[in-house]
């Protein structure tokens, strides 16, 4: 509550100073508002600005309007809008069949959420998902694509917004943001603050999130300089959350709100980011940009890990979970930098563009950990077992656990890359060819591992007619394993992941752009992919082990549609088919998947849609969304059942005021959002929830 009072006090002066501008505020919802509502032609993720129909890469953009209409708070609210993307765990997703966790901010590495917290959207202007072989532009990464979060920047024009939210699960919060020109010529500023607190659906679990964000934009004699600083504070009592145990048919063995954590367990993240970016246009043919980003974060996790299921009464049904207490501290800092040059020129009469760029990333992590295993018998010095049906918490105080001293693990990761991409246009043909050189070095304790690689990409686009194009592309991929994966405690070191990808597709902007669609087919082969060992911490050293597969092949098709059905009715829809399988075994048998089995958490079919209809004369709009995810297999080869979930929004706008009612999981479906391993269970989807957000703009 104190954070809300602070935000309200800070906005008092703003509100009084903005009264003179009220007369300039017009209705937000007007006739024709739906047309182009969710469209964004601009995207940073492609590096080389190109109209969608002229590009052999597919970029899906979730813009501010769609984020606002959905009342989206974090990245998980947006996955339905991107074909081929579904939830895996925490901030990770399945993209074109592969697990993908790394994300970018304004085109740079430096994730403040550290992998166990989901990115929040308060200071995000739009979310871009670059499909396919993004590694040629961004360096090593999963070939299914990558997320780029474009943050909010200062604007010369004054605007401000204040909002308050209340909802089920004891939810309440407030936010405020303001931007405009400062008294210094050529300088604009932005300030923002967000606070929200709520119970989360699992027993003992809560969420408290604070984000403070500020920035300056400075017009220079050559170009524009943006300076930004952001602080994140997430306090998650009753976390870190694992899943709820299931049987092999994917049915929960207990209530979806069951939690393996004690009331005193928690996950706490404090992170700060500073960033500077510069961009300039030199004449008509040369574009330059450069950026640097520094991130530091401290994440503390003290929680009870499910350590094994037991049938204590002999009826053939698991009824108790053994637990391991884990005390972990991750202190991390990293630097990221990148620069690009785009030169437009004629080469022997051929319209040409050349992109040259380089990037660099270094990360240091100090990981302190300790833990103690519980047993089936109640012990005064170790975690007690927890019933799945009648859990009793607090039997043994954590303060009485016999914990060993902390084990300290120091890792340092360095990445560097340079790339060239050449584009040539001859009539209706547009061809691209590019190469990238990558090098990396990981140091973990006394062990060191380094390597490099040269990878290639080529693409071709043919403009069948002004509103239709077909394209194809080929790319190689190269992805070093994470530094923490190289530790012998996890079974490392491991060789890098390598792969090859082919993609072809069609793009269109029919009916004067009112009907925009795309279709793609792809084939991806990757080797030496790491996956969690279902046996968990094999050596009892406090670190879960990993295993490497031989070869994984992913084949699929994707369809995306954005349509202005009428002047007041808009629809976005996506469908994806994927077949990801283990096509060559590396000889290890610890994982139950065998050659030909489906890969973990890779659904065969996914469907998502979001549709919005407005009543301009009433200032009212209603929206409905749906998300279908097909059957999957967990990492322990347990079934993860398919689900269909609906969400809805009602938006009422009157002058500068806006009210949003958001209903998640409209039918209160009980489902698993994804699978993990059998001892930790499947991640349950959230039950039905409702919130009201009231906001005012100046």
Where are these regions (language model features)?
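Face-selective signature of the C-terminal outer-membrane beta-barrel domain
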Residues: 274-297, 324-446
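Repeated loop/turn-to-beta-strand initiation elements of outer-membrane beta-barrel proteins
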Residues: 186-189, 222-227, 285-288, 349, ...
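Transmembrane beta-barrel wall of Gram-negative outer-membrane proteins
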Residues: 159-161, 166-239, 264-281
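Membrane-embedded beta-barrel scaffold of Gram-negative outer-membrane proteins
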Residues: 277-293, 297-305, 470, 497-586
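Gram-negative outer-membrane beta-barrel transporters
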Residues: 428, 547-635, 670, 693-697
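Structural signature of Gram-negative outer-membrane beta-barrels, strongest in the C-terminal barrel
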Residues: 219, 332, 351-363, 370, ...
